[in-house]
């Protein structure tokens, strides 16, 4: 529903919008996507890599499968999306890639190691790609955004450890976990 709502909102800006629901960790599916978009719109000017999953567990509790699943979406999904679309974007006179990191790509808290590694990785990947595009004098501009808490369904579909049971809307509980700078 939120994907459809977002597409509807963007119609007010007179831009062509495609919405595609795919598993971003599926490299083959991601690399097939640019041609579908080009067939629909004729070209691609902007890619917004925005996928995430929540895992709430300690490093010791997490399994290889947890790491593969989490980083497959959080980090490799962004890498796949970027690599799939980049050759097409470089053909445009102006183009942009926007990758969603997180405030947790800037700081860390307990029981979120997989999420943090993924989001720190997105930040590093994006900064590196931005420098490479400048080095090439490419028309592609590259950005990462680092939002804080946003009311999405990410927590509803994540893997959680019940030991971290705080109300993220409660300023005192957040401050106790993150420290006084979180207020």
PLM regions with names:
Residues 13-16, 36-47, 55:
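A glycine-rich helix->loop->beta "capping" turn
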């Amino acid at each position: 529903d939120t994907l459809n709502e977002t597409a509807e909102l963007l119609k007010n800006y007179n831009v062509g919008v495609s919405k595609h629901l795919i598993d971003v960790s599926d490299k083959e599916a991601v690399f097939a996507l640019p041609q579908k978009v080009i067939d629909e719109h004729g070209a691609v000017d902007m890619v917004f890599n925005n996928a995430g999953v929540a895992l709430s567990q300690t490093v010791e509790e997490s399994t290889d499968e947890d790491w593969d699943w989490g980083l497959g979406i959080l980090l490799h999904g962004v890498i796949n999306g970027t690599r799939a679309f980049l050759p097409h974007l470089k053909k445009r006179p102006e183009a942009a890639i926007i990758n969603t990191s997180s405030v947790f790509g800037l700081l860390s808290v307990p029981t979120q190691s997989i999420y943090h590694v993924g989001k720190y990785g997105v930040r590093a990947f994006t900064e590196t790609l931005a420098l490479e595009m400048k080095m090439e004098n490419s028309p592609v501009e590259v950005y990462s955004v680092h939002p804080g808490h946003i009311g999405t369904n990410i927590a509803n579909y994540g893997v959680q450890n019940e030991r971290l049971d705080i109300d993220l809307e409660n300023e005192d509980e957040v401050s106790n976990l993150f420290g006084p700078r979180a207020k």
